[in-house]
Amino acid sequence: MTQKGIFRNTIGALTLTLSMGIIAETAAYADEGMWLPSLISERIGDMQSKGFRLSAEDIYSVNQASLKDAVVLFGRGCTGEVISAEGLLLTNHHCGYGQIQKHSSVEHDYLRDGFWAMSREEELPNKGLSVSFLEKMEDVTSVILEGYTPELTEAQRDSVVNVNSKQIIKEVTAEGKGLRATVESLYYGNQYFLFLYREYGDVRLVGAPPSSIGKFGGDTDNWMWPRHTGDFSIFRIYADKDNNPAEYSEDNVPYTPKRFFKISLGGVREGDFTFVYGFPGRTQEYIMSEGVRYVSEISDPAKIALRTMRLDTQKKYMSESQKVRIQYSSKNAGVANAWKKWQGEMKGINRLGTVAAKQEYEKRFAKWAEGPEYSTILPRLDSLYGALEPYTFAREYYSETAASVELCSFAGSVAKKLAGGDNEGAAALSEAFFKDYYLPIDKESFVATMSAFVKDVPVEFHPEYLKEELSKYGSVSNWADALFGESLFTDADKVAKLEAADTAAMYADPAVRFANEFRKWYVSDVYPYEKRLNREITLLYRDYMRGQMEFEPKKAFFPDANLTLRVAYGSISGYSPADGTYYKPQSTLEGIMEKDNPEIFDYDIPQRLRDIYAAKDYGQWAITGDNGKKTVPVCFIATNHTSGGNSGSPVINKDGNLIGLNFDRVWEGTMSDIEFDPEYCRNISLDIRYVLFTIDKLAGAEHLLKEMVFVK
């Protein structure tokens, strides 16, 4: 199979059917959709009718530089954009947070104070961080299913898909030079796309504001509007002297991009066209009512309660110690992010009546699908969801309780590495663990969450190990005293002295035993059953998805997000979250000063910003506020359909210029992973002018501004 053959037009009868759904007249709701860039020509008319001035080729092209060449997958879960001819890269502060933390210490607290490289020599390398540019995407459905016939079993179909996928990936990455590829299933396996990337592994930290700007509002404001968070960080991509990907080397030079974003200083106004280009992570737009009911009535409430326990414990100790605050800043942010999202998702689903609406849709579908091909799908799905529920519940509780115990996870990982002779890997794990570990937090969280596991997970799902330990110690609290008191993995010096020969002692350690026994229980008693049931559900969704497309031939179906590059477009728009309340789409520096409070950590801004505000020293970044006085724009909201993974995505105006970077959604609209509602769903973006203001006036890093190209 040649590369030329792989990239030929492979659209067969099945793909044509799907494309008819994709090409259809309008989306289900205005501004709903995460569209594949390679098919954006089918949406460009709608985009242009809403104000967009560029062409489909300007958005995505394999024949010339296009906007896609300025967008990267940052790490393995965020988006970034190139903003200069010298590889300068912009993403969110929370996307770069882990790198900022790794470079921080009590002596050099870059989380608290910020960091700015005033020369190329001061830019900090980040081992393990990479960015990936999409070279091309291609429908390869016919190639992937070559050799498949309806007579084959699902296992045989999987084999065909896997063999053909590996062959395609091998051929398209043969050149090397940082190429990597994936074959992704769309529409539950009705369609397959090849994504070819070029990955750069030398990405250096250039600048980050202090957390009092980059995380302003903290967990209090997370998912909320109005928002005033300066959520950005700056990196630079480096390459070898031929501009090819290379691991870190002092000989590397700044990457020269095919395309970078020009920066608009024109600002935003209600109704302006907006366009988000990024890598949304996961959506479930087409699941049936029973799947939504489990999320809103069982899963979200349970996970919220469990994470509340951990967050309360972390915050208590973080407020008492600067060292602990630094150690747990990133961990706390990670725990809180989904915690608040789940709350908004649950409320949004209930407010919209999504379960009832889907049930009504399913009744109409069932009436239409009275023939043999689709008539049994919904009853079978309903039955499978009922069988799946207890296993999913057990898995989610395991993930939020036993698997979240820091000591035990660490102990299990180190023991495994030492037993395999990987002393260097064990030492690296140990160094990273003890740098950011505080035992009282972990122990108190253990007692709270494991007590919840004992109470909430049905007894028939309890591991035998759990029953034995509770019988032995009488309570979770006593069990915690013994486990944390007796484990040698709480002592860095003892861990450093361990060798592979100590295998027996390691595996007898209570922390290692906890990790291994719970893992063994999950692997044997939960995972196989959940996997089998999910597999059966997915196979039915392949048919249900195809049936929905036939049922609604004029609806534009977009594939669920799967961390592949997508286009979402909409407009600048305020919204009304409650009766008598309307939120304007722009926030300003005035809002920061209204919230500023040195007594509240989330709202304690740098003194430098207070001084700038007092002097009204805003420079060219000033605008006239609603009160007629000068201020600085901070954030804005729009109707673009986004998800996790869109963090850091460029927000682009009608001329293709950068106006901001996406970093959040409003709390009332977080159910958009399941159902998009144009009245409530808003993505929150950082205004690029606040980024520039911060670089100029707070950081004094004018040299970075000189790299950028500005347009009015």
What are these regions (language model features)?
Residues 12-22:
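Bacterial N-terminal signal peptides
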Residues 2, 6, 22-712:
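Terminal presequence/propeptide segments associated with secretion/organelle targeting
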